[in-house]
Amino acid sequence: AHGRCVADSEGTTVPRRKRPSTPNASNLDWYAVDLHMHTPASKDYQQSGVAYLDILRKAEKEGLAAIAFTDHNTVQGYAAMRQEITDLERWEQSGRITPEERSRLEEYRRLLDRLLVLPGFELTATFGFHVLAIFDPATPLRTIELTLLRLNVPAGLLTAGETEVGSTTDVVTAYRIMAEAGALVIAPHANSSHGVAMFGLGFGGQTRIAYTQDPNLHALEVTDLESSK
């Protein structure tokens, strides 16, 4: 998993709490979420033997209210989880489900009743910059795949989960295409590796402004570089 995004730095959990009262704002609920999470569908996923159910259990253990599967240049992780659930439900309806399968299905239902899981992907844009696109769970997976194709991810790599997929789309164009598709657009780890505002970036001020203040960009994920977490 990557950074939790509720106006916090990478690796810091934001507990659910009431926002402090101010003269000009009503009290609002705050939630702990992780909108930058990889799964075994990403080629560089480090852990072996991890099931999608394990990812949901860990999210529940950490007190998260929502997570987004944002694998590299693919929506395959989210698709694989949904397909597993669909298969389990079909076996249940046909009466051919085993006790172990029924237990998994019931666990999925319990967790998904408590946890919002959003589909998305992490695009590798031109010059290696990363951009997240996160969608409503009602969005058809085909729509998300077509968005990847519009971003010039090769059709043959749509399910590969590769971090490098050749020449895709420049950052600002990626923001626009993602927003037009209905995505929440986030620049991940913006001030560190592959981030649009990383230190030592050899671009001018106008480019930095465009990369960080474009109207189609909805949020920046930043990293606390001094933290050991």
Which residues does each PLM region occupy?
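Hydrophobic faces of well-ordered beta-strands that scaffold small-molecule active sites
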Residues: 33-35, 67, 117-119, 185-187, ...
